[in-house]
């Protein structure tokens, strides 16, 4: 099986650490799943961007997949109310 390398940007790490422990655990589990299949689960392309979002309950993981480099860059982790605001 081919795996992807997950790279979490500083902003996403900060956002993750600010969340309740149970939500952190769910998101970390989702990130682990993304290593083997980045588009599994509730994933949709974000309109007007090359990024995708994965839904984890009320939270969203915003990420970019580089198929050539086999990397997933985690850009943001936020509550759905804030996820789509720029």
Indicate where each model-derived feature is located.
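A short, surface-exposed loop/turn module that caps and links secondary-structure elements
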Residues: 30-54
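Charged, low-complexity, helix/coiled-coil-prone segments
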Residues: 1-7, 33, 51
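Enriched for short, Lys/Arg-rich terminal
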Residues: 2-18, 22-25, 40, 56, ...
């Amino acid at each position: 099986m081919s795996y992807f390398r997950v790279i979490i940007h500083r902003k996403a790490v900060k956002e993750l650490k600010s969340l309740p422990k149970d939500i952190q655990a769910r998101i970390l589990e989702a990130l682990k799943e993304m290593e083997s299949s980045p588009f599994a689960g509730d994933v949709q392309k974000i309109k007007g961007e090359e990024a995708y979002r994965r839904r984890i309950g009320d939270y969203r993981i915003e990420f970019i997949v580089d198929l050539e480099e086999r990397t997933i860059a985690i850009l943001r982790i936020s509550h759905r109310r804030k996820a789509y605001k720029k």
